């Protein structure tokens, strides 16, 4: 009887050791995933910090009341807002359009969806959007994360770093890139987007995106249906 109990104890010890090793292995895999993800997020912040735009503006002297031109430089996240709402845009090669627009927002309100590419500003953010797509894709395709909910948790970390004007640019940019658009709709990446920042005639309606792009609960329902 004693020998039988000893064998049973040994068997239980082996089971416990195996479970502990599996737990340690799972923890190491998750830590490796997170380390890579946070490296990617740090690079994303570096790309934002590297954004720079120089423009000229008129300033009136307090003493002489005369106007003079000065050059100013904006950097980082400020560039997103400036390009969207303030950058002067005109189309000298278009004989039917002599208007100077104030930001991409006005171009979108004039030309609709086609105005995004017509403005010729989006290439400034090419590296930014390509890397953001890599981050979302890395999470979505991760074998270390089990199911939509686990992946959504990390997508939430990414989304939490997006400013209001980054979300606006993401909304318009992704209309032209189906793969990015699909990830946005899958994980409600635009749930914090404020519709009042969108150009006129654009909204959170299904004409542009599936409801899941803005509604995490709906995105969860769709994901669970797919996982069944």
Roles of regions detected by a PLM:
Residues 19-228:
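Intrinsically disordered, low-complexity polar regions and short flexible loop motifs
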Residues 1-17:
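Transmembrane signal-anchor/signal-peptide helices with a preference for the extracytoplasmic
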């Amino acid at each position: 009887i004693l020998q039988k109990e000893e064998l049973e104890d040994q068997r239980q010890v082996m089971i416990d050791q195996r479970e502990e090793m599996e737990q340690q292995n799972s923890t190491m895999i998750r830590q490796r995933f997170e380390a890579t993800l946070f490296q990617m997020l740090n690079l994303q912040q570096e790309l934002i910090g590297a954004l720079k735009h120089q423009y000229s503006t008129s300033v009136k002297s307090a003493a002489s009341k005369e106007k003079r031109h000065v050059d100013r430089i904006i950097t980082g996240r400020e560039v997103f807002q400036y390009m969207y709402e303030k950058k002067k845009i005109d189309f000298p090669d278009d004989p039917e359009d002599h208007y100077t627009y104030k930001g991409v927002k006005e171009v979108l309100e004039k030309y609709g969806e086609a105005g995004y590419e017509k403005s010729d500003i989006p290439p400034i953010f090419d590296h930014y959007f390509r890397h953001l797509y890599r981050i979302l894709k890395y999470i979505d395709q991760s074998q270390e994360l089990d199911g939509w909910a686990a992946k959504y948790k990390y997508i939430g970390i990414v989304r939490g770093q997006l400013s209001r004007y980054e979300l606006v640019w993401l909304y318009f940019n992704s209309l032209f890139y189906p793969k990015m658009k699909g990830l946005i709709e899958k994980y409600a990446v635009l749930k914090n987007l404020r519709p009042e920042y969108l150009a006129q005639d654009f909204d959170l309606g299904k004409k542009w995106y599936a409801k899941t792009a803005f509604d995490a609960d709906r995105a969860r329902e769709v994901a669970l249906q797919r996982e069944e």
